[in-house]
């Protein structure tokens, strides 16, 4: 099975994908939706960086059908994750003002031992297809201005930079009780430019 075929059959249930691309020959991958109320999420939280605050956020959004957590499992352990969210949170409501209804790809993370093997591209593609399936015609994400590898990945995947509130960057506050300020760029991509993968 090719990566594209695996992405096409994704249907919000556990999907086993066994493709044989050069960089992934040794891995049998599982891409799955992980509910924040499930025991697999407990494992995902331990294996990937998920704070208690973010978990609470995801639980709330999931109950409202406004978030889908996708994870990649290799050899029985989680090595990557991403969230498709229908909101931008309180700290970045300026985005919702300029781009109402824009869903976001959020919290993309790949274990450092599994990077540069196509897993990030696969997770972004699956998240885009899920957004398409949900009826969205555009998707966005925030990328830290100093994160050159992520910016290159998103540019390669067809994302383009947008201004928010008349500025090239926006502030994102992360962490409690003493939040740290990150400078981000908004990137968006039309989901109508590619054939529907459903």
For the regions a protein language model found, what residue spans apply to each?
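Structured loop/turn residues at beta-strand edges in well-structured enzyme cores
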Residues: 65, 77, 117, 134, ...
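Generic detector of contiguous secondary-structure segments
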Residues: 59-73, 136-151
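Conserved residues at the C-terminal ends of beta-strands
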Residues: 85, 142, 165
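Acetyl-CoA-dependent GNAT
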Residues: 18-112, 124-126, 130, 191-194
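Conserved glycine-rich acetyl-CoA-binding loop
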Residues: 107, 111-125, 134, 145-152, ...
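C-terminal "cap" of GNAT-fold acetyltransferases
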Residues: 2, 9-18, 137, 144-151, ...
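Residue-level detector of high-confidence beta-strand sites
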Residues: 81, 162-164
């Amino acid at each position: 099975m090719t990566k594209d075929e695996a992405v096409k059959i994704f249907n919000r249930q556990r999907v086993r994908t066994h493709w044989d691309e050069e960089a992934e020959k040794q891995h049998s991958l599982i891409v799955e939706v992980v509910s924040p109320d499930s025991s697999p999420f407990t494992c995902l939280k331990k294996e990937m960086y998920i704070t208690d605050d973010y978990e609470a956020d995801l639980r709330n959004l999931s109950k409202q059908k406004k978030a889908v957590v996708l994870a990649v499992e290799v050899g029985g352990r989680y090595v990557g994750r991403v969230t498709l969210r229908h909101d931008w949170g309180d700290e970045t409501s300026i985005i919702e003002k300029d781009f109402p209804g824009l869903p976001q790809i959020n919290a993309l993370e790949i274990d450092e031992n599994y990077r540069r093997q196509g897993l990030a591209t696969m997770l972004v593609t699956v998240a885009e297809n899920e957004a398409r399936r949900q009826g969205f015609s555009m998707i966005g994400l925030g990328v830290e201005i100093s994160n050159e590898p992520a910016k290159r990945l998103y540019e390669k995947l067809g994302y383009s930079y947008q201004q928010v509130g008349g500025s090239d960057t926006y502030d994102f506050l992360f962490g409690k009780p003493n939040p740290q300020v990150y400078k981000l760029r908004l990137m968006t991509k039309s989901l109508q430019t590619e054939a529907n993968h459903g």
